[in-house]
Amino acid sequence: MATRSCREKAQKLNEQHQLILSKLLREEDNKYCADCEAKGPRWASWNIGVFICIRCAGIHRNLGVHISRVKSVNLDQWTAEQIQCMQDMGNTKARLLYEANLPENFRRPQTDQAVEFFIRDKYEKKKYYDKNAIAITNISSSDAPLQPLVSSPSLQAAVDKNKLEKEKEKKKEEKKREKEPEKPAKPLTAEKLQKKDQQLEPKKSTSPKKAAEPTVDLLGLDGPAVAPVTNGNTTVPPLNDDLDIFGPMISNPLPATVMPPAQGTPSAPAAATLSTVTSGDLDLFTEQTTKSEEVAKKQLSKDSILSLYGTGTIQQQSTPGVFMGPTNIPFTSQAPAAFQGFPSMGVPVPAAPGLIGNVMGQSPSMMVGMPMPNGFMGNAQTGVMPLPQNVVGPQGGMVGQMGAPQSKFGLPQAQQPQWSLSQMNQQMAGMSISSATPTAGFGQPSSTTAGWSGSSSGQTLSTQLWK
């Protein structure tokens, strides 16, 4: 109801203000625009106190509120102060004040741009303003007492009510400001905190305490050491050892000290047995590794080249399809002297009658390309190296026997076009390398060329020598 009564009062005041403005517009000077003299102005600049048209109202808005404050006569709501300003000034007094220095033959502009320039010169720059009129108006206002704006009692009562309402509002604001510092803020906050604590305490007491659950150890790495159960002299290992696949040597070593059993039996033998078991488990890999290393060293020492200079013999069977039979060949530890005395290039060297060269149809003597320093084969240009007769002896000691009277592998004889593997193996069995007597020369038939002889002493040359 209060809001409705306030609305009714405001509506009545607005109607009264409209009546006052309509009376002011009926005056002769107020019927035309104060700036462009257009008929029927419906807008007003209440701080200046003039009535203007809608076009000039837009220009006044562009000037800014510090210069001109525009209101509509019909659409906006007016206050008593604004109405008072309009009654005090009006278009007649405004022209006398702002157009005092205007030229006599001055023609008012009609275009928008020209009107804007004129309004700015008139109100913003105060180009035509009368400074003496300000002093006159100030003196007259100070000497003459203030007269009521409107003789009607209703308007005067409305103005008085507005003043009373404003005074009441000011008093209320002052009372509120006085009450604010008196109210203590800290005790309230302390009381609120205490209430919150009291509300939270019963909640905490009602909630049951959860027992601390032990963490589940999936791998059994962090579990505590379980003491072994002793029954007399026998010991039972803990259950964690059965679950641990890798044993105590990787990630879960057994503790050095064992917890004493629950009973009063002595735990010294149990600890001793556990220590021995753990040490035995730990030594499994170390013993195996050391044994394997020793065996490998022994095999390497046997298979090394230095062991080939010994006198032991190893029999080895020949594989089928290979032309070399079981041999019994020792390796000489000293270089033969026959190769040091080889002649130079281009010197014919006599060959023994039973050589491979005779088998292939070569002459008894052949050319040796280069001197051979401590080697068994000549240069690649010589073809086949001639060998002495002792290599081919009647015993059939080497491949050189192919040139013997039997001519097992000789190509000139047509009676034996094919090679017999069995005969080859039988005659290759007597091949050996002598290590006792060095040869005297290549041309001597009684001595071997590269230290070859029919003696069977020494170690057999096997396929392991070339691995």
Swiss-Prot record:
UniProt-recorded Gene Ontology molecular function terms: clathrin binding; GTPase activator activity; zinc ion binding
Location of the protein in the cell: Cell membrane
Biased composition (Polar residues): 145-155, 413-438
Compositionally biased tracts (Low complexity): 446-467
Membrane keyword on record: yes
Keyword Metal-binding applies: yes
Tissue localization of expression: Detected in bone marrow, adrenal gland, trachea, lymph node, spinal cord, peripheral blood leukocytes, thyroid and stomach.
Membrane topology: Peripheral membrane protein
UniProt keyword terms in alphabetical order: Cell membrane, GTPase activation, Membrane, Metal-binding, Zinc, Zinc-finger
Domain (Arf-GAP): residue spans on this chain: 18-136
UniProt motif Interaction with clathrin heavy chains: location: 218-222
Major localisation: membrane
GO biological process, one term: positive regulation of erythrocyte differentiation
Biased composition (Basic and acidic residues): 160-185, 192-204
Zinc fingers typed C4-type, residue spans: 33-56
GO-annotated cellular components: cytoplasm; plasma membrane
InterPro entries: ARF_GTPase-activating, ARFGAP/RecO, ArfGAP_dom, ArfGAP_dom_sf, ArfGAP_SMAP1-like
Record text on subunit structure and interactions: Interacts with ARF6. Interacts with clathrin heavy chains via the clathrin box-like motif.
Function: GTPase activating protein that acts on ARF6. Plays a role in clathrin-dependent endocytosis. May play a role in erythropoiesis.
Record's protein name: Stromal membrane-associated protein 1
Organism: Homo sapiens (Human)
Gene: SMAP1
